[in-house]
Amino acid sequence: MGSIYSQLFVKLSLPDSSTIKNKTILVTGSNTGLGLEAARHALNLGAGIVILAVRSVLKSEEAKTDITRADPDLMERVLVWPLDLESFASVRAFISRAREYVSNGGRLDGVILNAGIASLAWRVTEDGWERSLQVNVLSTALLALGLLPLLLQASSKDPDSNLSKPHLTILASDIHKTAMFNERHAENILSVLNDKDQWGKSQQAGGATERYAVTKLLDIYITQEIAKLVPLSEDGEPRVVVNCVAPGFCKSNLLSREEGVPVVVKMLQWAVGRSVVEGSKTLIYAVGMGSESHGCWVEDQVVRE
């Protein structure tokens, strides 16, 4: 959620346009909030194609109109693809669509996996998983693994340019530092995380944001493990940069969608939260970072670990 100091005084910047210009950038959860503004930044920085991956195609068409209002000619550079992270079938269909897009002459240069939820109530998806566990972790990992080969294909077209390296950026959060994650001692961690009784115990012990914090911690682990799968080029550098980024505590609708959010959290959000325009700079900046960020956690646009 960011320290009070960084929330108020750290000045965020956009990446050099050369890291985005003419590239194809895909952003999940991009019909509103951080995702929408990250897509807008990409378009303004000269991205050749921006793909809005969204649950509601209708709302995303509205988002498409929004980010191209200043220049309607940009409409043809924005694509809208349906994606529901609460459904593994939807994720697989999305990956298939991306493969078809690339096989037909398209390319994928940057992926920002921004979509996520902060569920404060026990809910199960159609696939039988606790909702935030599936959306923030399982589907995010599945999507990342499915899109990585397509990013590698783009890498093979520009093998010598560090600035042209494809990127896979996962949205994390520094709230992971608060996670108690007592389930880490279990023999089958995912099974325990998917147990309703254990979920209740964890929420009672760690507070209302415990599950969200755990999922964001797991996103960092996902980043580290996927980074290990990336082959190296002849100079020893990764062919695709995989990183995760914290946008800080932002005035997005992540919390407003849920009931039971502690009043103190809402007050902090109002008092020190970054605007989504500002916070989204961290996402698009991460897509322009070099190999030093590979497998790492990025906070306030600085590699932390």
Explain the meaning of each model-derived region.
Residues 149, 253, 296:
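Flexible, active-site-adjacent loop/turn segments at secondary-structure boundaries
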Residues 117-118, 250, 260, 302-303:
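Short connector loops/turns at beta-strand edges and beta->alpha or beta->beta junctions
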Residues 3-5, 9-249:
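Rossmann-fold NAD(P)H-dependent dehydrogenase/reductase core
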Residues 220-224, 252, 277, 281:
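Feature representing long, continuous alpha-helical segments
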Residues 267-304:
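C-terminal helical subdomain
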Residues 8, 304-305:
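Short, contiguous pre-domain boundary segments
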Residues 1-12, 205, 249-278:
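Alpha-helical membrane-targeting segments
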